[in-house]
Amino acid sequence: MSKTAIITGSAGGLGKGIAERLANDGFNIVLQDINEALLLETEKEFKEKGYQAVAFKSDVSKKKEQEELVQFAVTEFGQLDVMVNNAGVDAVTPILEIGEEELSKLFNINVFGTLFGIQAAANQFIKQKSKGKIINACSIAGHESYEVLGTYSATKHSVRSFTQTAAKELADKGITVNAYCPGVAKTEMWDRIDEEMVKLDDSLEIGDAFEAFSSEIKLGRYQEPSDVANLVSFLASNDSDYITGQSILTDGGLVYR
C-alpha cells in the first residue's frame, strides 16, 4: 500500500514543490491550504499529472481543524505516514513597532499550527500502532535572528524547540520529528519581505534586499523549491529513520551551525 503524506500550506510556493516531490516518490498526497481557489487549482493540476492527490481547506491555527485534516487523510487513504507542517507566514517590522496583531497572527500560524499538527499526526500514528514521520518548516531564522524579522525569527526558534521536544517525547513510539530550514528562495514570501524592506529603507529598490541576502550564499545562487523538496523527500523516506530532533539547514551555505 502506498504511503500517505499531508503537506500544509501546499497550494503554492515551497509547499507545492514539496508535495509534488513526494507525489513523484509515490506518496498519496493530501494538499492543505487556507486559500481555497489556489488549493483547488493545485489539486486539479496534480490529478492531471496522475498523482493521487486530494485537497482539504482548513486553518492550521485551529487545533480542531488540524485533527479534522488528519482524519480526512485517513478516511481518504486508510492511514497517515508523514506529516509536513509547512504552512507559515512572515512579517517585516522594526522591533519597536511590533504589535499584538502581528504577534498573534504569526504565532498562531507558525507556532500553534505546527504544534497542533505535531499533536494530531502523533496521535494518529499512536492509534495506528505505526511508526511515523513529522517534518516541520523551520528556517535559517530559526538558527539566527534577523533585523526587522524579529517576530518571524522568534516563531521559527519556537518551531525548532518544539521539534526537539517532540522528538524526545515521541521517540519511544517510533515517531521521528525533524525540521527543514530553508534560506533565500524566489517565492511569494520572499517577494513580500523584499517589498516591505524597501518601504523601511528609501535607498532600496525592489529586488535589492533579495539580492543582498542572495549574495551571501556561498554556492552562488538562490534557493529553488526543489532544493527544499529534496531534503523533505529524504526526511520522509526510510533512509532518515535514524535521524530525529534535527532542524537541518538547506540554504546553500548561508548560516553555519
Swiss-Prot record:
It comes from the Bacteria. InterPro entries: 23BDH (IPR014007), NAD(P)-bd_dom_sf (IPR036291), Sc_DH/Rdtase_CS (IPR020904), SDR_fam (IPR002347). The active site is at 152 (proton acceptor), 156. The keyword DNA-binding does not apply. Its EC number is 1.1.1.304. Substrate binds at residue 139. GO terms for molecular function: diacetyl reductase ((S)-acetoin forming) (NAD+) activity; quinone binding. Pfam families: adh_short (PF00106). It is an enzyme of class 1 (oxidoreductase). Belongs to the short-chain dehydrogenases/reductases (SDR) family. This is Diacetyl reductase [(S)-acetoin forming]. It comes from Staphylococcus epidermidis (strain ATCC 35984 / DSM 28319 / BCRC 17069 / CCUG 31568 / BM 3577 / RP62A).
